[in-house]
Amino acid sequence: MTFSEILDRVGSMGHFQFLHVAILGLPILNMANHNLLQIFTAATPVHHCRPPHNASTGPWVLPMGPNGKPERCLRFVHPPNASLPNDTQRAMEPCLDGWVYNSTKDSIVTEWDLVCNSNKLKEMAQSIFMAGILIGGLVLGDLSDRFGRRPILTCSYLLLAASGSGAAFSPTFPIYMVFRFLCGFGISGITLSTVILNVEWVPTRMRAIMSTALGYCYTFGQFILPGLAYAIPQWRWLQLTVSIPFFVFFLSSWWTPESIRWLVLSGKSSKALKILRRVAVFNGKKEEGERLSLEELKLNLQKEISLAKAKYTASDLFRIPMLRRMTFCLSLAWFATGFAYYSLAMGVEEFGVNLYILQIIFGGVDVPAKFITILSLSYLGRHTTQAAALLLAGGAILALTFVPLDLQTVRTVLAVFGKGCLSSSFSCLFLYTSELYPTVIRQTGMGVSNLWTRVGSMVSPLVKITGEVQPFIPNIIYGITALLGGSAALFLPETLNQPLPETIEDLENWSLRAKKPKQEPEVEKASQRIPLQPHGPGLGSS
C-alpha cells in the first residue's frame, strides 16, 4: 500500500482537502501584496529642487530640462551672479535644500529623498527584500525537511507579520531594509511549506487543479493591492495593512496538519495515524479510519520508514546523472522565470500608463493564463507546458526590442502577454519541481530551485543599467534568458499521471522505464496506479 491508496481510504478529495487548500490559499492571496508592495510604497513622483529659503520658485531658480520641465536634480546657484548676461550661463548646483514632490501620496522615496544620487537606494530596498527570500530558501528548505513543514509555515507567518509591521514603523531607511529582508525571509518559508503541504495532501488527479487554485489566490491578491494603494496614500499605513493579517494566519495555521509522508519518514507513524483518523472523520469515513492500524501503516510504508535513517543534503541533488540533469534544467528554468518576471512586474512605471490600472491589468492576465495552464498541465503534460510558457515569454520580450517607444499600447500588450506567460511558468514550475524530486529530498530541492528564481529577481534590476549604453540591451538579455530556460525544460521527464518518487532510487527506475520499450502494458498500468493514479496535477505548491 502506498500513501496515495491510504489517502483514498480516508478521503482523497473531501471536505478536509477543500478546507486545507482554503487555509493555505488565504495567506498566498495576501502574500502578493508584499511581493509587489514596492511598486506603490516606492513610487517616484515628479519632483524638482526645493528653492533656497530666500528665493521664490521660478525659471530663474529652476533650470528647464530638454522636455521643457524643471530639472529634477539641479538648480541655479543662488543668489545669481549679476555680471552674467543671461541665465543660460549661470552655474548650477545639486538640490541642497531637498526636493518638492508633485504628489498627494507619500512613499519611502519622498520620505527619505531616494532620488537623484540616492535613487539606487530604492532599487537596493527591493534587492534586499529578494535577498531575504533567497536566503530563506536556502535555510528553511533544509529546516523543513528536518523539523517538519507545519512548524516552518507557522513561524514564517509570525515572522512576516512582525517584520512587516516593523517596517511600517521604521524610523530610518537602513532599519526599513532590515525589516524588508526579514519579510522576504518569511515569505520564502510560506511559499515552500505551502507548496509541499498542498501537493502531499491532494490526490494525484487533482494536483494540477488545486495547485493552480493557489496560484489564483496570488492573482487575486494582485487585484487587491492597487485598490489598497489607492485608498491608503500613506506608505506606512499601507505597509501595516498588508502585514497585520498574517497574525491571523499564524493562529489559523495551528489547524493545518503535518505532512503524513514527512511524519512517516521521521519515525512518527503514531502521530501520522492520529491525523489520518481525524481526516477520515472530517471526510465522513470514520470507519475506514478506525480500520487503519499502526502496524498496518508501518508494514505498508516500511520502505519509507527505513529512509528516515538516511540524511540528505543539497549535494545529493547531484548524486546520479538523472538527478543532476533535472537540477540543472530546473535551476535554469527557475532563474529565467524570476529574472524575466520581475523585469516586467516591477517595471510598471516604464510603460507610461496609469500605475493602478496597469497593475490591475497585469494581475488580470493571470486569470486566463492560469486557466490555460490547468488545461495544458492536465492534457499536454508538464514539460510541454513549461517549455511553451518560457519560450512564448522570451519571444514577447524580444519583440519589445523592435517596437518604438512611442507605441506605448503595443509595448504594453506585449508586456502583459509576456507577464501572463511567466505567471504560467511559475505555476507550472512549483508543481513540476515538487513532482520531480523524491520525497526524501523534495523540500531541499524546492529550496534550491527557489534560490535560483530569487537570484534571477535580484539580478534583474541590475540588467536595466545596461540600457544606459543601448536601450535595447536589457530586453535582449531578458528575452534570450527566457528562451534558454524554455529550451532546458524540454530535457525534463514528464510526470503527468506518474507516481511521486519517494527515493532517489525511484528516479533511477524512472529512467530505466523510460529507456525500455512498452512491453508489459498490464504491469505499467498497475505501477501507475500505485501512488498516483488516484489523482492528478497542481500549482505552485509542494
Swiss-Prot record:
Membrane topology: Multi-pass membrane protein
PANTHER family reported for this sequence: SOLUTE CARRIER FAMILY 22 MEMBER
Consequence of changing residue 260 to R: Complete loss of function
InterPro entries the record matches: MFS_dom, MFS_sugar_transport-like, MFS_trans_sf, Orgcat_transp/SVOP, Sugar_transporter_CS
Gene Ontology molecular function: organic anion transmembrane transporter activity; prostaglandin transmembrane transporter activity; solute:inorganic anion antiporter activity; xenobiotic transmembrane transporter activity
PTM annotation (Phosphoserine): residues: 4
Record localization: Basolateral cell membrane
Name by which UniProt lists this protein: Organic anion transporter 3
Disulfide bond entries: none
Location of the region described as Disordered in the Swiss-Prot/TrEMBL record: 515-542
Outcome of mutating residue 281 to A: In 6% of African-Americans
Keywords for this protein: Cell membrane, Detoxification, Glycoprotein, Ion transport, Lipid transport, Membrane, Phosphoprotein, Transmembrane, Transmembrane helix, Transport
Impact when changing residue 149 to S: Complete loss of function
